[in-house]
Structures are given as structure tokens and as C-alpha cells.
Design a protein with these regions (language model features):
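Generic alpha-helix initiation/capping and coil-helix boundary signal
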Residues: 4, 60, 106, 137, ...
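Extended, charged amphipathic alpha-helical segments
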Residues: 187, 191-298
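Intrinsic disorder/low-complexity detector
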Residues: 51-54, 59, 65-67, 74, ...
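N-terminal start-of-domain structural block
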Residues: 1-32, 179-218, 233
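Extended, regular secondary-structure scaffolds
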Residues: 106-216
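Extended hydrophobic/Leu-rich segments
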Residues: 4-8, 31-34, 43, 51, ...
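Extended, helix-rich architectural segments
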Residues: 1-133
């Protein structure tokens, strides 16, 4: 193979890897805003540096979970359990036993579809304590693989396996799962195969729900607009709290004092000793908090 072809293929791999990592970060952000987990890092941290870290010595970052409220309110299909009728009572009872988890899982699947766009749902058979039924598990982040003529139906999927990382003594490396219609492989982050099983279903046991028809990409956009609104409100309300604090206490200033003896903010029962000609005062910043609240409501 010529150097030109090698460079082209490597550049394509690099671009695809960057897109995959960017998509994973985006899904993590959507999930974090839905669960209200560490959302402060998106307004003051490496993900989004809108505030100096010293600002949060004055007030804590505002954390409004608008995303969860909106997604849960929007997801109303499974508010009431559907009526599934196969034509006779005996068949209905047997079918109901097979779908023991379905109504509960579908409610969550609908919410995650509205949130992340196109989750992968693993349909699996479960036998536990005499109960035999279908089970449904959501995979939020994954990489799907397609044959060239068909960009709509994946033939294989790879995703990271959830691990008990909160356990103090858990030190195992990250594991991944590979599925196609013939095999299921578990491998670690170094590519070492740990387990391999034949696929008992004979088909890829995943479905990919979406709230809109596929347009230019297999992976749906998700509720990035809702999360962006949530982020803007968190920034706005944090600014408001900082403004209120400075309006209440003001910003102290001094002139005619020695540089090596700065004046610190002190209590109302303390005296401040100023040199001859020294001046001290407190300024309140401008701004109208009521207008900020009106913007937030709008």
C-alpha cells in the first residue's frame, strides 16, 4: 500500500475516533444534566469556563434541573399501561407474563430516547427464580457498524460495560462488549478478549428507538436544546446570586494606604485604622436583579 493511501486511511480513522469521543462527551453531558450530576463543571471547569473559580468562594453555582422536568413531562406515552390483546384470555395471560418488565422499562426507554436521541436497547431473555420473561436494558453510548449499502440498520455494536466503580476495592480495567448476529465478545481496554460466546438469538439483539426519522446521521441529536437552555439558566442565576451578594455587601475600596498592609473585609464591630490622608469606602454595583428574573422567566 502506498504512503498516500496509508495517510488517507489513518486520517479517516482519526476523524472517526474524534467524532466518537465527541459524541460520548455530548451524551455524558445530556445524562449529567438529566441526573443533576456535576453540572457545575460545564459553567466553571474544563468543560466551560464562564466563571473564575474564586467566584464560587462567594456563592455556590446554581443548579436547576430543568432537563429532567422537561424530559419527564414530554415522555407521556407510557403514562398509562397499554392494552395488549392477542385475541383470547389464555394467550393474553401468557404474553403478560413474558412482558413482566416491559411497561416499566419502556417508560425509561421513552425518556432516554427523548434525551439522547437514539439509544440502543438490548432485548434479552431472563430466567430468574422460576420467572421467564423478556428484559430490556438501555445502552446510552455505543458505536454502531454498518455495511456500505445500508446506513440504516447496524450489523454490529460495541459499547462500554457498566462497572461497579464505586466499590473501593474494584480496580479492574474498563471492559467492552461486542455483538453481531453470530457472536458476543467481552474484551478489555487493551483489546484482550476475556470471554466469547455464540449469539443465542441469531440476530443482533438490539433495537434503536428514535423520536425523529433518520436524516443525515444514524445517531439522533437528542435534547441538546433543552440542556443548552438549562445551562444558560444556571449561568444567569449564578450571575444573579453574585450580583445580589455584591449589592448587599458592596465592594470595599481604599486609597492612601500602604501596599504591604491591605485592608481585608471585616465585621461591623471592628475598627479600621487608616493612615493620614487615607480613605475607605464601599461601592454597590449597578444592575437591576428584577430585570434578570424577568429574563429568566421569559
Amino acid at each position: 500500500m502506498s504512503y498516500a493511501k496509508e495517510i488517507i486511511q489513518q486520517s479517516i480513522k482519526d476523524i472517526k475516533l474524534q467524532k466518537s469521543r465527541a459524541r460520548r462527551r455530548q451524551i455524558e453531558k445530556l445524562l449529567n444534566y438529566y441526573t443533576g450530576t456535576d453540572t457545575w463543571k460545564y459553567i466553571s471547569g474544563k468543560e466551560g469556563n464562564y466563571f473564575d473559580s474564586a467566584s464560587f468562594n462567594e456563592v455556590p453555582p446554581y443548579n436547576m434541573n430543568l432537563t429532567k422536568k422537561f424530559i419527564d413531562k414530554k415522555s407521556r406515552i407510557y403514562t398509562l399501561s397499554p392494552n395488549r390483546d392477542l385475541g383470547n384470555k389464555s394467550a393474553n395471560n401468557q404474553y403478560k407474563e413474558l412482558l413482566f418488565y416491559k411497561n416499566l422499562r419502556m417508560k425509561h426507554i421513552e425518556r432516554m430516547t427523548n434525551l439522547v436521541g437514539t439509544p440502543a436497547v438490548r432485548v434479552m431473555w431472563e430466567e430468574d427464580e422460576g420467572k421467564k420473561c423478556f428484559e430490556y436494558r438501555v445502552v446510552y453510548y455505543y458505536d454502531a457498524y454498518f455495511t456500505p449499502p445500508n446506513p440504516y440498520h447496524p450489523y454490529a455494536i460495541i459499547y462500554p460495560i457498566l462497572n461497579p466503580t464505586q466499590e473501593v476495592d474494584y480496580t479492574e480495567p474498563v471492559e467492552f462488549a461486542y455483538w453481531d448476529d453470530k457472536v458476543n465478545i467481552i474484551y478489555d481496554e487493551d483489546g484482550n478478549i476475556k470471554e466469547e460466546y455464540p449469539n443465542p438469538y441469531g440476530v443482533l439483539p438490539f433495537v434503536f428507538p428514535r423520536d425523529t426519522e433518520q436524516i443525515d446521521d444514524f445517531y439522533g441529536e437528542g435534547s441538546t436544546d433543552v440542556v443548552a437552555t438549562n445551562e444558560h439558566l444556571n449561568i444567569l442565576m449564578t450571575e444573579l446570586m453574585l450580583g445580589l451578594r455584591f449589592q448587599m455587601f458592596g465592594q470595599s475600596w481604599a486609597s492612601g494606604v500602604y501596599e504591604d498592609q491591605p485592608i481585608a473585609r471585616v465585621g461591623s464591630d471592628k475598627l479600621i485604622n487608616l493612615p493620614d490622608g487615607g480613605r475607605f469606602g464601599i461601592e454597590s454595583p449597578g444592575g437591576d436583579p428584577q430585570k434578570v428574573l424577568e429574563i429568566a422567566k421569559g
